[in-house]
Swiss-Prot record:
Function: Structural component of the short non-contractile tail. The tail complex is involved in viral genome delivery. Forms the end of the tail, including the canonical tube, the nozzle, and the small extensions below the fibers. Once the tail tubular structure is formed, the interface between gp11 and gp12 generates the proper environment to interact with the six gp17 trimers.
Keyword annotations from UniProtKB, A to Z: Viral genome ejection through host cell envelope, Viral penetration into host cytoplasm, Viral short tail ejection system, Viral tail protein, Viral tail tube protein, Virion, Virus entry into host cell
Protein name: Tail tubular protein gp12
Cytoplasm found in the keyword field: no
Compartment(s) of residence: Virion
Amino acid sequence: MALISQSIKNLKGGISQQPDILRYPDQGSRQVNGWSSETEGLQKRPPLVFLNTLGDNGALGQAPYIHLINRDEHEQYYAVFTGSGIRVFDLSGNEKQVRYPNGSNYIKTANPRNDLRMVTVADYTFIVNRNVVAQKNTKSVNLPNYNPNQDGLINVRGGQYGRELIVHINGKDVAKYKIPDGSQPEHVNNTDAQWLAEELAKQMRTNLSDWTVNVGQGFIHVTAPSGQQIDSFTTKDGYADQLINPVTHYAQSFSKLPPNAPNGYMVKIVGDASKSADQYYVRYDAERKVWTETLGWNTEDQVLWETMPHALVRAADGNFDFKWLEWSPKSCGDVDTNPWPSFVGSSINDVFFFRNRLGFLSGENIILSRTAKYFNFYPASIANLSDDDPIDVAVSTNRIAILKYAVPFSEELLIWSDEAQFVLTASGTLTSKSVELNLTTQFDVQDRARPFGIGRNVYFASPRSSFTSIHRYYAVQDVSSVKNAEDITSHVPNYIPNGVFSICGSGTENFCSVLSHGDPSKIFMYKFLYLNEELRQQSWSHWDFGENVQVLACQSISSDMYVILRNEFNTFLARISFTKNAIDLQGEPYRAFMDMKIRYTIPSGTYNDDTFTTSIHIPTIYGANFGRGKITVLEPDGKITVFEQPTAGWNSDPWLRLSGNLEGRMVYIGFNINFVYEFSKFLIKQTADDGSTSTEDIGRLQLRRAWVNYENSGTFDIYVENQSSNWKYTMAGARLGSNTLRAGRLNLGTGQYRFPVVGNAKFNTVYILSDETTPLNIIGCGWEGNYLRRSSGI
């Protein structure tokens, strides 16, 4: 029997649900309210700092959709969509007024988490209700001065000697003029275009007594009286219409139009059948003396704004307006040449912003607005394509692929359906000609939680029978066009229950957070670290805020996480700061690890001279009620007083009674955090040069003792369980006799704590527990025992 030992360098690997013989040495069985720091080791998670009470338990609805608005460092808000309305809070918990100039029907829903999607661009938060069908306005419009079959033009270009000009309207000649043969010098005047126009108009006025005939620069405008119309309109000039030609509201080509025309006169350019150009409409602008492309006649040109995505807009007064958006109408073409975007007549599933275009997902289509014109989904011209025209493309796959989410990713747009992923990209400028949409991968995706991008990775949820897997989507190194995904929960397959509704995280602190209504009191944390494109750390654990608590949101800005949570009485906003060695509150003697931590000045009138106690009323401190948890009061000199939860809960006896007269004193109050870390079984493990781990599974390991290495740590307890026997060992922080030990101050210890562990290693359970307010940093651990093996391996 040989006495052996093994050291484990760190405990940064989180937990694993694999059998103990398959785990890495740095992985444990359970980690609650811990933080796996790649530099400081295993720590207590940062504390919740109380910011404000947002209302009672139901103030934000049953299952609200909560969106973080991060405009800049001074304008940061939580927008809460309750299902019946919107509430906006800044990140100090102060509520902003939300006005509804067009009502709030668009965001009314029984399930806002499932039905609402949104994206923020500057002061605008664009909001989509996936249950609302975008509809067109069925009212047809006509621009002013359009008189179908009532008027027409004669384009007069000039004359040619000896030619006869004839104007024929409704079956009769209304003007006829023979140009002289040019034998006399004065005949040149008879070939002048304007002279010919006046001559023909004079005859037309005589032959069409009730009609209006006007002459312009190079044209004649004839208008039928009320009750009559132009049924036929032709001209003859003996020169193939090169001298004069009729211009009704239809023309074969743009070259047939006169240089000038009455203001607002409209013509449809039918086009040459031998050319691929679409038909289009032009209208004369007399002020600018040009023909401009315009909207056709009897055309539906507008969507119903009330059925389109709305916006929550930050106003100049600091409050918010929820309102319709003024979506641009069509400016050219008709229903055939300028069709409706594919989202009209369908519901919109997501809204996004990509390459300076606002985009929608609807059915199997991706629709992008014109460049920098976010409310315009129609081309500026039918006759000429432009690089800034809108884009409307559909995915191509043999399966039905209803698109659910779009996430900008590595200069591309990653698009998700329930079972497949697509990438929209373009070489160079993104235009309707250069756009490419390709199927890249096929992974199942959970619809309720939006995929979230952190760095060069996108994290998404894949549901299984009872639990959810989280995948990391990435571009393969050196081959950016090749995409893949890996299951980062493969070693904890039964950890996150189904019902995931939020995936967030921070690229600053390298973590991803997951919320699930299957276990609403927890934040599931994935801590990772990549160095030179290699994964150096992946750690799963969870933060537990108590079974009576629901976490509604936990989104991050830089190194701060802002958490909205509620207990059975009230709803709160709190902050978690990941900054190392941070002092959360001014005057705090040290960073106290307490949840809902608050600085409080004890008011006068709270001291009772008879009992020599100062009584603090918990609802007065927070403006809210609490039911469960151990409370600690920390004084500026480091003295702490711990209050156990009353049997019936704090709501039955909401008073903290402190010894002595503390009126006017500043104290720090909060709920203790229960940190738990359970080690994997202490087994003999070998790590190869390639990083793989093998476990000695032959023989018997009889443990004798174990140790943990700690740094700048307060007190913690170690529990050892060996079947029916249980032991508890306490590390009290700084040791007696230490030069750094001072009365009335924070005393932290650094060193190694050794404790007995006896029995077969396969049956020992060892875990650390700490609910004190002091820090905890476990760097590594190790064990010592007798190893007996009957045979030698080969």
